[in-house]
Amino acid sequence: MTATGRRLRADAERSVQAILEAAERVLKEDPAATLEQIAEAAGVARTTVHRRFANRDALLAALAESAWRQIAGAVEGARPATAPPLVALHQATANILAIKSGWTFALGQPATNEEIGRLQQAVYAACDEVFRRAQQAGDIRAGVDLAWARQVYLALINETAHGPTGGGEPDAAAARILDVLFHGIG
């Protein structure tokens, strides 16, 4: 989509996706990289980058928005409102870990526009819903502060994705996260 909401042609969408993927790779290595360096890594002309993104800030916002769209889609794909709560939580966790490993720079950017904030809130709301359903099913003790549980859960995901050992295979890492979350370390 363009800034005006018009749908891009398929080749233009491919160019934008190539630019975003190259931006993630290049900026992860050198956060001060120029748009020209990103264009070179994407295999497109510098003018193509400038035509799609007015400036560096616009590119960074689009990069973060794209990554958060993927996260939101991954969470929704886990069927948080209909799947059994622990199944939804495991699938969402594995999906998120798979995305986080490829979009570390983008997901580390601050929410710079309303759409990113909306996507983040949708992800957090889905997480809260799964936690409520898990508590109702008896998987989480009554009386547990679900807001605190979500913070711990998200911290476990972030540490798994960005910690010194790396995340590993997403499904196995999700199982480890949920084991620690639901059974502790003792």
Task: Annotate each predicted stretch with a short phrase.
Residues F53, L60-A67:
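Alpha-helical DNA-contacting segments of helix-turn-helix folds
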Residues A12, A64, W68, I116-Y124:
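Amphipathic, non-transmembrane alpha-helical scaffold segments
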Residues V87, E115-L119, Q136-V152, G168-A173:
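All-alpha amphipathic helical-bundle segments outside canonical DNA-binding/catalytic cores
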Residues M1-A3, Q91, Q121, A125, ...:
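C-terminal peripheral helix-coil segments that are non-catalytic and often amphipathic
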Residues G43-F53:
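Short hydrophobic/aromatic patch on the recognition helix
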Residues M1-E29, A33-A41, A58:
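Basic, helix-initiating cap at the start of DNA-binding domains
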Residues A18, Q37, A58, V87-Q91, ...:
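Amphipathic alpha-helical interaction segments
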